[in-house]
Amino acid sequence: MTISPPERGEKAKGGVPTPYDQPVDRGNAPVDFEKLNKPGFWSSKLSKGPKTTTWIWNLHADAHDFDTHLGDLEETSRKIFSAHFGHLAVVFIWMSAAFFHGARFSNYTGWLADPTNVKPGAQVVWPVVGQEILNADLGGNYHGLQITSGIFQMWRAWGITSEVQLMALAIGAVVMAALMLHGGIYHYHKAAPKLEWFQKIEPMIQHHQIALIGLGSIAWAGHLIHIGAPVSALLDAIDAGNPLVVDGVSIASASDVTNLAPKLCDPAIASQIFPSLAGRTVENFFTLNWWAFTDILTNKGGLNPVTGSLWMTDISHHHLAFGVFAIFGGHMWRNAVHGVGHSMKEIMDVHKGDPILFPAPKGHEGIFDFLSNSWHGQLSINLAMVGSASIVVAHHMYALPPYPYIAIDYPTVLGLFTHHMWIGGLFICGAAAHAGIAMIRDYDPAIHVDNVLDRMLKARDAIISHLNWVCMWLGFHSFGLYIHNDVMRALGRPQDMFSDTGIQLQPFLAQWVQNLQQSAVGTGQLVGAGNLPGNVLSEVFNGNVIEVGGKVAIGPIPLGTADLMIHHVHAFTIHVTLLILLKGVLYSRSSRLIPDKAQLGFRFPCDGPGRGGTCQVSSWDHVFLGLFWMYNSLSVVIFHFSWKMQSDVWGLTGGNFAQSSITINGWLRDFLWAQSSQVLTSYGQPISMYGLMFLGAHFVWAFSLMFLFSGRGYWQELFESIVWAHNKLKVAPTIQPRALSITQGRAVGVAHFLLGGIATTWAFFHARLIGLG
């Protein structure tokens, strides 16, 4: 059955376009506060007010679904564009709050003076109801809450050395928030862009790639070169016990650096720290004498032994190079100003693909038009890419720590890894959600015939059935290895276990990659002509242990049987998540069970009475189920990371990962139970808030099960009996109580499941590492 997408307003029907002389409409929509007094003003049904309690849930569910409010792509685009400015304003206010707390309440300068012994603290808890116990002794005569965001380490890398500078940033961020709010109002109510402006893809890419990313990265490189790196060099020298002398004055403290900071843009001063800043930088640049910059734009590699972080001059070099690449890449596209360059539509239309491996005769024809008319399609791709990038960042943050002293702040390292993993997982689930919406609302089967998208849909049974086979294979085999080990250990037969001392299952490919990286040192194998210095590679590749302040910043990460086993659990959970999410997209419009699924929309509970077994098959329900498996996947990842680092790198659990993590019982006993002692015994200590959070989050998680285990009918019957009792007492409400719909109940359930699970893990991790000191 062919089901076309709904019409989306005059601008989306593909008729004769209006002349594109001005990119905006002036005086588009005057500000109207009256309609805001009527909740649900965008819907004729909701705007009538509540008759049942379902009204408030529909209000929440549909508030941001601009597609259904308007049915017009131009107006939807304008609202989204305006909302972006509002979002940026919120981000700037949040940043301002962080800067303000740092300036007014924190121990930033105390930490800066002794970063290996003083712990970061954001604020002091006021003893309103006697909760001053939460103020821990963080060193340097400061009692307050210990923070684990890495913000102090980041500020030091920026070159911030005083509370005055933080307060200036706080004020600046508020000003930027005001500008963003004004921008949002202006670009919707005063000068609203036309649909054609939003659909000019090449200029949009150029603006983002050249102006925002390219020039932004180079501008940041400029800050690092002139402020960040010199300040870091001065502070590093102080921490190493060999303060630098600038203009005849020994720079022996952070306050000395603060006093010197305004002079760092003076070449005579800056060149005493980095000679290449001596004032002939422009001449050297334009005469191609770039070797003059090798002290400020370096390729040292490895970590700074004083701070346990990447060299600031390496980071400056990275941002400069990245910005140049982005600018070159952005100029690849053709725009209205000059007719030179590539057209993305032309590239995609002629790109056919492999006729044997992927037989789609029309290749990518129609894909450009689909994406330039489907913001859900674009958002899906962007969410998948940014989510994947967040997961990449999570793994780089500990292997190549970018900020000074962050590597020895173990709660922060674990917190940032966990944070970036959760963000990545949620974004990837969001990618599946918006891909499903795009397929239902924006996809026209009559246009997509024999192209790659059509080919994917035709091959969906093969794709999903193969994924299903892979998931079963991985699940049975990975879990089977653990069950075998539990049985053998229970029977007292360690020699028959899969382990490094029994039946070995060594990850030889991963070990080969590690050895390849390490053996490439000095051979030029990885960098072409030049030889590779010994410290270019991360220390995790069979490198050296780097200690800072008596704590391990980074060291080699050995891999063995335990890692191979948990790796296959990772593969299993990730493939199941992919199976669920991909099935939701590929079967979003139709299936053998429900051929007319596209007409039912993105979310629907069941396909009407008399058609049994058709509940929970909507694209929305696949995202719902995918979120649980995403949670499973990432729980295994962050537990693996936490235990592995404590055992094999930080030296906190005596290297017990290799022998304990190869059984289910080992995970329960030596990880969950043994490491939860800090959170369970936290009462009466500054970490007691994590004990309360641990219990409260468990309650939130358990609360979710009430929504996930019970059916709607159960609750409706219960409500009707309660309403009957109210009627008998003549106190019946005017708004009729209704049980949540199946979809609403599942949404509340998964939200509390994830919130409870994440907050429980948060309390468990932080209490563990903060409690150990």
UniProtKB/Swiss-Prot annotation:
Which keywords describe this protein according to UniProt? 4Fe-4S, Chlorophyll, Chromophore, Electron transport, Iron, Iron-sulfur, Magnesium, Membrane, Metal-binding, Oxidoreductase, Photosynthesis, Photosystem I, Thylakoid, Transmembrane, Transmembrane helix, Transport
Sequence segments annotated as region (Disordered)? 1-29
Record SUPFAM superfamilies = Photosystem I subunits PsaA/PsaB
- The residue ranges crossing the membrane are 80-103, 166-189, 205-229, 315-333, 375-398, 414-440, 462-484, 564-582, 622-643, 687-709, 747-767
Bilayer topology reads: Multi-pass membrane protein
Q: What is its EC number?
A: 1.97.1.12
Question: Which residues hold [4Fe-4S] cluster?
Answer: 606, 615
**Where along this sequence does the record place binding of phylloquinone?**
715
What processes in GO biological process is this protein linked to?
photosynthesis
Matching InterPro entries, A to Z?
A: PSI_PsaA, PSI_PsaA/B, PSI_PsaA/B_CS, PSI_PsaA/B_sf
The free-text cofactor remark is:
PSI electron transfer chain: 5 divinyl chlorophyll a, 1 divinyl chlorophyll a', 2 phylloquinones and 3 4Fe-4S clusters. PSI core antenna: 90 divinyl chlorophyll a, 22 carotenoids, 3 phospholipids and 1 galactolipid. P700 is a divinyl chlorophyll a/divinyl chlorophyll a' dimer, A0 is one or more divinyl chlorophyll a, A1 is one or both phylloquinones and FX is a shared 4Fe-4S iron-sulfur center.
GO MF annotation, one: electron transfer activity
- GO cellular component assignments: photosystem I; plasma membrane-derived thylakoid membrane
Entry coiled-coil feature ranges: none
Catalysed reactions, semicolon-separated: reduced [plastocyanin] + hnu + oxidized [2Fe-2S]-[ferredoxin] = oxidized [plastocyanin] + reduced [2Fe-2S]-[ferredoxin]
Q: What's its top-level EC category?
A: oxidoreductase
Q: Which PANTHER family match?
A: OUTER MEMBRANE PROTEIN, OMPA-RELATED, PHOTOSYSTEM I P700 CHLOROPHYLL A APOPROTEIN A1-RELATED
Q: Outline what the protein does.
A: PsaA and PsaB bind P700, the primary electron donor of photosystem I (PSI), as well as the electron acceptors A0, A1 and FX. PSI is a plastocyanin/cytochrome c6-ferredoxin oxidoreductase, converting photonic excitation into a charge separation, which transfers an electron from the donor P700 chlorophyll pair to the spectroscopically characterized acceptors A0, A1, FX, FA and FB in turn. Oxidized P700 is reduced on the lumenal side of the thylakoid membrane by plastocyanin or cytochrome c6.
To which protein family does this belong? Belongs to the PsaA/PsaB family.
Q: What is this protein called?
A: Photosystem I P700 chlorophyll a apoprotein A1
| Organism for this UniProt entry | Prochlorococcus marinus (strain MIT 9211)
User: What gene does this protein come from?
Assistant: psaA
